[in-house]
Protein backbone atom coordinates (compact mmCIF):
# COMPACT_ATOMS: atom_id res chain seq x y z
CA UNK A 1 0.00 0.00 0.00
CA UNK A 2 1.55 3.34 -1.06
CA UNK A 3 1.95 6.34 1.24
CA UNK A 4 -0.76 8.39 -0.52
CA UNK A 5 -3.35 5.65 -0.03
CA UNK A 6 -2.42 5.30 3.67
CA UNK A 7 -2.88 9.04 4.15
CA UNK A 8 -6.26 8.92 2.40
CA UNK A 9 -7.49 6.12 4.67
CA UNK A 10 -6.25 7.94 7.77
CA UNK A 11 -8.01 11.13 6.65
CA UNK A 12 -11.23 9.22 6.02
CA UNK A 13 -11.02 7.67 9.49
CA UNK A 14 -10.56 11.11 11.06
CA UNK A 15 -13.49 12.58 9.11
CA UNK A 16 -15.82 9.72 10.04
CA UNK A 17 -14.73 9.79 13.67
CA UNK A 18 -15.39 13.53 13.79
CA UNK A 19 -18.79 13.08 12.14
CA UNK A 20 -19.65 10.33 14.60
CA UNK A 21 -18.71 12.50 17.60
CA UNK A 22 -20.75 15.42 16.25
CA UNK A 23 -23.71 13.11 15.77
CA UNK A 24 -23.36 11.81 19.34
CA UNK A 25 -23.33 15.39 20.63
CA UNK A 26 -26.45 16.18 18.59
CA UNK A 27 -28.07 12.99 19.86
CA UNK A 28 -27.41 13.99 23.47
CA UNK A 29 -28.85 17.46 22.84
CA UNK A 30 -31.97 15.80 21.41
CA UNK A 31 -32.75 14.44 24.87
CA UNK A 32 -35.68 16.26 26.48
CA UNK A 33 -37.71 15.69 29.63
CA UNK A 34 -40.72 13.55 28.77
CA UNK A 35 -43.86 14.71 30.63
CA UNK A 36 -45.20 11.15 30.73
CA UNK A 37 -42.16 9.61 32.39
CA UNK A 38 -40.38 12.58 33.94
CA UNK A 39 -37.18 11.24 32.39
CA UNK A 40 -34.96 12.29 29.52
CA UNK A 41 -36.14 10.81 26.23
CA UNK A 42 -34.52 10.75 22.82
CA UNK A 43 -36.36 11.75 19.68
CA UNK A 44 -34.83 13.15 16.51
CA UNK A 45 -38.23 14.03 15.06
CA UNK A 46 -41.02 16.51 15.71
CA UNK A 47 -44.49 15.12 16.38
CA UNK A 48 -45.47 16.02 12.79
CA UNK A 49 -42.52 13.98 11.53
CA UNK A 50 -43.49 11.12 13.83
CA UNK A 51 -47.00 11.16 12.34
CA UNK A 52 -45.49 11.10 8.85
CA UNK A 53 -43.44 8.03 9.77
CA UNK A 54 -46.54 6.27 11.10
CA UNK A 55 -48.54 7.19 8.02
CA UNK A 56 -45.79 5.76 5.81
CA UNK A 57 -45.61 2.50 7.80
CA UNK A 58 -49.38 2.03 8.01
CA UNK A 59 -49.99 0.46 4.54
CA UNK A 60 -46.99 -1.82 4.98
CA UNK A 61 -48.37 -3.08 8.29
CA UNK A 62 -51.79 -3.67 6.75
CA UNK A 63 -50.24 -5.75 3.96
CA UNK A 64 -48.18 -7.77 6.43
CA UNK A 65 -51.17 -8.62 8.64
CA UNK A 66 -53.91 -9.37 6.12
CA UNK A 67 -55.37 -5.89 5.97
CA UNK A 68 -57.77 -4.12 8.31
CA UNK A 69 -60.52 -6.19 9.91
CA UNK A 70 -63.75 -4.94 8.34
CA UNK A 71 -66.24 -5.03 11.17
CA UNK A 72 -67.55 -1.50 11.58
CA UNK A 73 -69.13 -2.08 14.98
CA UNK A 74 -65.94 -3.60 16.41
CA UNK A 75 -63.77 -0.91 14.79
CA UNK A 76 -65.85 1.83 16.41
CA UNK A 77 -65.77 -0.01 19.73
CA UNK A 78 -61.96 -0.26 19.77
CA UNK A 79 -61.63 3.33 18.58
CA UNK A 80 -63.92 4.53 21.37
CA UNK A 81 -61.92 2.70 24.05
CA UNK A 82 -58.63 3.86 22.58
CA UNK A 83 -59.65 7.50 22.34
CA UNK A 84 -60.99 7.43 25.90
CA UNK A 85 -57.56 6.34 27.10
CA UNK A 86 -55.57 8.58 24.76
CA UNK A 87 -57.53 11.62 25.92
CA UNK A 88 -56.27 11.16 29.49
CA UNK A 89 -52.66 10.61 28.38
CA UNK A 90 -49.95 13.25 28.15
CA UNK A 91 -50.50 13.46 24.37
CA UNK A 92 -54.26 13.96 23.97
CA UNK A 93 -53.94 16.32 21.01
CA UNK A 94 -52.18 14.05 18.51
CA UNK A 95 -54.22 12.25 15.89
CA UNK A 96 -54.43 8.78 17.47
CA UNK A 97 -55.35 5.92 15.15
CA UNK A 98 -56.54 2.53 16.39
CA UNK A 99 -56.59 -0.28 13.82
CA UNK A 100 -57.78 -3.89 14.06
CA UNK A 101 -55.62 -6.17 11.95
CA UNK A 102 -57.25 -9.11 10.19
CA UNK A 103 -54.92 -11.70 11.67
CA UNK A 104 -55.39 -14.70 13.97
CA UNK A 105 -52.03 -13.89 15.52
CA UNK A 106 -52.25 -12.65 19.11
CA UNK A 107 -50.47 -9.32 18.91
CA UNK A 108 -50.66 -5.61 19.63
CA UNK A 109 -48.08 -2.93 18.94
CA UNK A 110 -47.53 0.76 18.30
CA UNK A 111 -45.55 2.77 15.76
CA UNK A 112 -44.56 6.46 15.86
CA UNK A 113 -47.23 9.09 15.40
CA UNK A 114 -49.95 7.51 17.53
CA UNK A 115 -50.65 4.45 15.38
CA UNK A 116 -51.88 1.57 17.57
CA UNK A 117 -52.59 -1.91 16.19
CA UNK A 118 -54.38 -4.89 17.71
CA UNK A 119 -55.16 -8.16 15.95
CA UNK A 120 -58.56 -9.81 15.86
CA UNK A 121 -56.84 -12.86 17.35
CA UNK A 122 -56.02 -10.89 20.48
CA UNK A 123 -59.48 -9.34 20.68
CA UNK A 124 -61.03 -12.82 20.55
CA UNK A 125 -59.15 -13.77 23.73
CA UNK A 126 -60.29 -10.75 25.75
CA UNK A 127 -62.96 -11.51 28.34
CA UNK A 128 -64.23 -7.97 28.76
CA UNK A 129 -63.72 -4.31 27.88
CA UNK A 130 -61.29 -3.73 30.73
CA UNK A 131 -58.89 -6.33 29.31
CA UNK A 132 -59.01 -4.70 25.87
CA UNK A 133 -58.49 -1.32 27.51
CA UNK A 134 -55.42 -2.66 29.34
CA UNK A 135 -53.85 -3.76 26.04
CA UNK A 136 -54.54 -0.41 24.38
CA UNK A 137 -53.36 1.54 27.44
CA UNK A 138 -50.05 -0.35 27.40
CA UNK A 139 -49.48 0.50 23.73
CA UNK A 140 -50.44 4.14 24.34
CA UNK A 141 -47.82 4.08 27.09
CA UNK A 142 -45.16 3.08 24.56
CA UNK A 143 -46.10 6.10 22.43
CA UNK A 144 -46.22 8.63 25.27
CA UNK A 145 -42.91 7.31 26.61
CA UNK A 146 -41.51 7.77 23.08
CA UNK A 147 -40.27 4.19 22.96
CA UNK A 148 -40.75 3.73 19.17
CA UNK A 149 -39.07 7.10 18.59
CA UNK A 150 -36.10 6.36 20.85
CA UNK A 151 -35.67 2.97 19.21
CA UNK A 152 -35.49 4.62 15.78
CA UNK A 153 -33.07 7.23 17.13
CA UNK A 154 -30.87 4.50 18.61
CA UNK A 155 -31.03 2.65 15.30
CA UNK A 156 -29.88 5.77 13.42
CA UNK A 157 -26.98 6.29 15.80
CA UNK A 158 -26.06 2.61 15.63
CA UNK A 159 -26.05 2.75 11.83
CA UNK A 160 -23.50 5.56 11.93
CA UNK A 161 -21.50 3.57 14.46
CA UNK A 162 -21.49 0.48 12.24
CA UNK A 163 -20.18 2.54 9.33
CA UNK A 164 -17.48 4.17 11.44
CA UNK A 165 -16.40 0.96 13.17
CA UNK A 166 -16.19 -0.85 9.85
CA UNK A 167 -13.79 1.70 8.43
CA UNK A 168 -11.81 2.38 11.59
CA UNK A 169 -11.51 -1.18 12.91
CA UNK A 170 -12.06 -3.22 9.77
CA UNK A 171 -14.50 -6.04 9.06
CA UNK A 172 -14.53 -7.39 12.63
CA UNK A 173 -15.59 -4.02 14.01
CA UNK A 174 -18.34 -3.76 11.42
CA UNK A 175 -19.69 -7.21 12.28
CA UNK A 176 -19.73 -6.41 16.01
CA UNK A 177 -21.46 -3.08 15.37
CA UNK A 178 -24.02 -4.75 13.11
CA UNK A 179 -24.77 -7.36 15.79
CA UNK A 180 -25.29 -4.65 18.42
CA UNK A 181 -27.49 -2.71 16.01
CA UNK A 182 -29.75 -5.66 15.24
CA UNK A 183 -30.15 -6.45 18.93
CA UNK A 184 -30.86 -2.85 19.95
CA UNK A 185 -33.66 -2.50 17.39
CA UNK A 186 -35.17 -5.99 17.68
CA UNK A 187 -37.40 -5.45 20.73
CA UNK A 188 -38.32 -3.17 23.58
CA UNK A 189 -36.21 -3.54 26.68
CA UNK A 190 -37.65 -4.93 29.91
CA UNK A 191 -37.47 -1.46 31.44
CA UNK A 192 -39.44 -0.01 28.52
CA UNK A 193 -42.10 -2.70 28.84
CA UNK A 194 -42.34 -2.03 32.57
CA UNK A 195 -42.59 1.70 31.92
CA UNK A 196 -45.41 1.12 29.41
CA UNK A 197 -47.17 -1.04 32.03
CA UNK A 198 -46.96 1.75 34.61
CA UNK A 199 -48.24 4.34 32.16
CA UNK A 200 -50.99 1.97 31.05
CA UNK A 201 -52.18 1.58 34.64
CA UNK A 202 -52.15 5.38 34.98
CA UNK A 203 -54.38 5.82 31.93
CA UNK A 204 -56.72 3.00 32.96
CA UNK A 205 -57.21 4.66 36.33
CA UNK A 206 -57.79 8.09 34.80
CA UNK A 207 -60.34 6.62 32.39
CA UNK A 208 -62.13 4.86 35.27
CA UNK A 209 -61.13 1.33 34.32
CA UNK A 210 -60.04 -0.88 37.19
CA UNK A 211 -56.48 -2.06 36.48
CA UNK A 212 -55.92 -5.76 37.14
Listing of model-derived features with the role each one plays in the protein:
Residues 2-20, 26-212:
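A Zn2+-metalloprotease active-site environment signal
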Amino acid sequence: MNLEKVKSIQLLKLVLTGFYLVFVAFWIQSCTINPATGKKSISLNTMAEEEKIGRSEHPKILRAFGGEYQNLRLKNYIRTIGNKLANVSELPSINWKFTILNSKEVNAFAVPGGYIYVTRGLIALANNEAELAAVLAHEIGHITALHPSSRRATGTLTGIGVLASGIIFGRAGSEIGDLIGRYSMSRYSKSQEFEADLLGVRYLSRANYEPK
